[in-house]
């Protein structure tokens, strides 16, 4: 059941979608404001912008106009949902199911010609929204996605001063100090150490019990042994509870393995605290002009970071900082819009899938 009051400015189509719970009043207000500021009179453009705002609430940073109708109808065809709705909402949903939607091809052409929407080649912040292939973004989120893709690719391409041979030698030395009998890294774990030691960004992916914490401890030990001048190490996670778990897990695992303690890694913070969150309107203390003072940054539960927060983190990472992202692909998604894809990093062999 929708609890939103339908805005007076809503067209019949937008009003029906709002009553059915597909759109919120805020979605309609945003789309109306953008169209008014950009002198856009096409109702299909206002519909697309309102649906793009809706997609943000659903966890996606973009709208695909070609598939949104099927997506919405599938979501509305939920027996559990229908059992909770009142008669007004049920009637509105029936109207949505019978509603005539814009023809996808014509809709795309209209969006391409809109004064409110930039294309992929336009300058940054030229217009409030942007159409990139079949994806319609609000400009901020398109820029964040571009920042993440560009910065991750750059970090993955940059090799560190540690060679493969040096990494292998140091790893053998570290394994000799481990006091657990018969301890031996498997092929995936060795690849994880090599990726983290020889690249400025690496991703350790795996579910519970795949040894992610053990690998973080060994990687940090290898980095410390390979570089006697290794400076500050930061441990971080999206939430305070996750950061505390990471700190405790690294400390206990390092002790159990008999690894040398790393005092610089004894503290853990949220990603917001790491970046120096200064409150609404003030942004972060650390950014591309004032970068983080760490040699290594480990981020646990990285799969829960939003695209926007990852963009801010990558902006604040300098050329000499190693970033180690740890995550479970089956974890809950970010509470904010967008999830980060690491697919393009696989070509650089910096994404390691750990298995039990």
Regions found by a protein language model. Name each.
Residues 348-356:
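Positively charged, low-complexity/disordered segments
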